[in-house]
């Protein structure tokens, strides 16, 4: 089973369990729609009184090592990373992280410079189709070997840190503010990992009493803790292909571009709700 299929099935199962706990009194305003369906993954309106309705936006991951995004179509133009797939929410999140990571930008510039120097001076960006600047497919191999023998390594970023995780939190907070529904004056952003939940942010005049009552509605006897730190890992690299083909059966060389980021390490003080 593909990882993204399993993740969506787990998300649907978590939604169904929470929906059962909350009942008809607290209806869903957003349901699981699959990868790249937008923000939030799902959400419920908690009715604490006639004039006290609070939208709880929930971002869901099925494990503390869940992949948050991946792509094989990014490009680097010398100053920034981008992807032609502008509709993919997950890819845009990943691109944002890459462009806000100094190590990734510096190594992107290093590799682009090496491609210009050791492969072809007409190279203007790193991408999966970049070697096509040399029209003769079999002339690409010695040039790719020249690049491979002279560049330091293929890594662009390999970072695991709270700083990276906190960038994800900041990104979620930004999306949260942009996706508050008109006319809803109180909103809560929560993150759910497997069967545990944390509060990430609030908007409007949400009180401590409100937060306690929200936790009660979810079946918890204690208030949800705030998510203060999140550890994540970012991996970005390129990989030349075709260099190991035998001399008597040569193949055109190509460049693979890869990027992924995932959670790493379980946050503390989560509240089990399902």
PLM feature segments, named:
Residues 41-42, 175, 256:
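Poly-acidic low-complexity segments
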């Amino acid at each position: 089973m593909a990882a993204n299929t399993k993740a969506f099935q787990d998300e649907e199962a978590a939604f169904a369990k929470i929906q059962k706990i909350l009942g008809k009194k607290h209806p869903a305003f957003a349901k699981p729609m699959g990868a790249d369906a937008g923000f939030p993954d799902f959400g419920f309106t908690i009715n604490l009184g006639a004039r006290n309705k609070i939208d709880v936006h929930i971002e869901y991951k099925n494990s503390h090592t869940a992949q948050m995004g991946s792509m094989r179509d990014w490009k680097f133009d010398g100053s920034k990373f981008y992807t032609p797939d502008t509709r993919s929410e997950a890819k845009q999140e990943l691109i944002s992280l890459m462009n806000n990571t100094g190590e990734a930008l510096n190594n992107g510039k290093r590799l682009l410079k090496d491609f210009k120097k050791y492969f072809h001076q007409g190279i203007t960006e790193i991408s999966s189709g970049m070697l096509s600047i040399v029209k003769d497919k079999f002339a690409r191999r010695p040039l790719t070997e020249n690049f491979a023998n002279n560049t330091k390594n293929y890594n662009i970023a390999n970072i695991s840190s709270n700083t990276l995780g906190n960038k994800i939190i900041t990104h979620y907070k930004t999306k949260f503010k942009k996706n508050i529904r008109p006319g809803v004056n109180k909103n809560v952003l929560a993150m759910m990992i497997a069967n545990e939940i944390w509060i990430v942010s609030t908007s409007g005049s949400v009180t401590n009493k409100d937060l306690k009552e929200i936790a009660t509605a979810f079946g918890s006897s204690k208030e949800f803790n705030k998510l203060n730190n999140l550890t994540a890992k970012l991996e970005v690299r390129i990989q030349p292909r075709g260099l190991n083909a035998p001399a008597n059966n040569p193949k055109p060389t190509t460049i693979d571009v890869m990027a992924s980021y995932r959670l790493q390490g379980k946050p503390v003080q989560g509240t089990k709700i399902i």
